[in-house]
Swiss-Prot record:
This is Ecotin-like protein 2. InterPro entries: Ecotin_C, Ecotin_sf, Prot_inh_ecotin. It comes from the Eukaryota. Belongs to the protease inhibitor I11 (ecotin) family. PANTHER family: ECOTIN (PTHR35890:SF3), PTHR35890. It holds the Pfam family Ecotin.
Length: 158
């Protein structure tokens, strides 16, 4: 299956009949459909990390982060949540790059975020980013040993 696709890939936002706002001319809308894991497992053992960012030309020596925020909003009368991302400036460490590391190449620069969101296969995760932004996400799961693992996935624009 291609990256970003899942067993829930046959779903569309129209299946939910909820009036999610259309993206503005300055936005992209990403919709994430999650595979069912069972109610208790979804509630206790799975979380979703949203990783918004932007592709920027950066060197290979420094660590870069994008500033910004993720605002949670609710569709009035429905109770369904969606998220609006604001991206601001990029910051990085100040190491002197040498050799190939000095070459600036396009790379995804992620926004700093610590939030984990509920895994709910019954509803899509709808995220609006700036037009020049991208969205990636990770599914975090708990193993019986108590340690967590994550799988990184590119979100699909819809």
């Amino acid at each position: 299956m291609p990256a970003g696709m899942s067993g829930a890939a046959g779903k569309t936002l129209a299946n939910f009949k909820a009036p999610y706002p259309e993206p503005t001319s300055q936005q992209r809308r990403y919709v994430i459909f999650l595979d069912p894991k069972g109610y208790r497992k979804e509630l206790n053992d799975y979380k979703v990390e949203l990783i918004p960012g932007r592709v920027e030309k950066v060197d290979g020596a420094n660590v870069y982060r994008m500033g910004g925020s993720i605002e949670e909003r609710t569709i009035d009368g429905w109770g369904y949540t969606y998220y609006v991302v604001t991206l601001t400036t990029m910051s990085g460490t100040l190491m002197m790059p040498l050799g190939d590391a000095a070459l600036k190449r396009p790379r995804f620069v992620a926004m700093s975020t610590n939030n984990l969101y509920r895994y709910n296969s019954q509803l899509p995760i709808v995220v609006y980013t700036p037009k020049d932004g991208e969205l990636r996400y990770r599914i975090w799961t708990v193993k019986s040993t108590g340690s967590g693992t994550a799988k990184s996935i590119n979100a699909r624009e819809m």
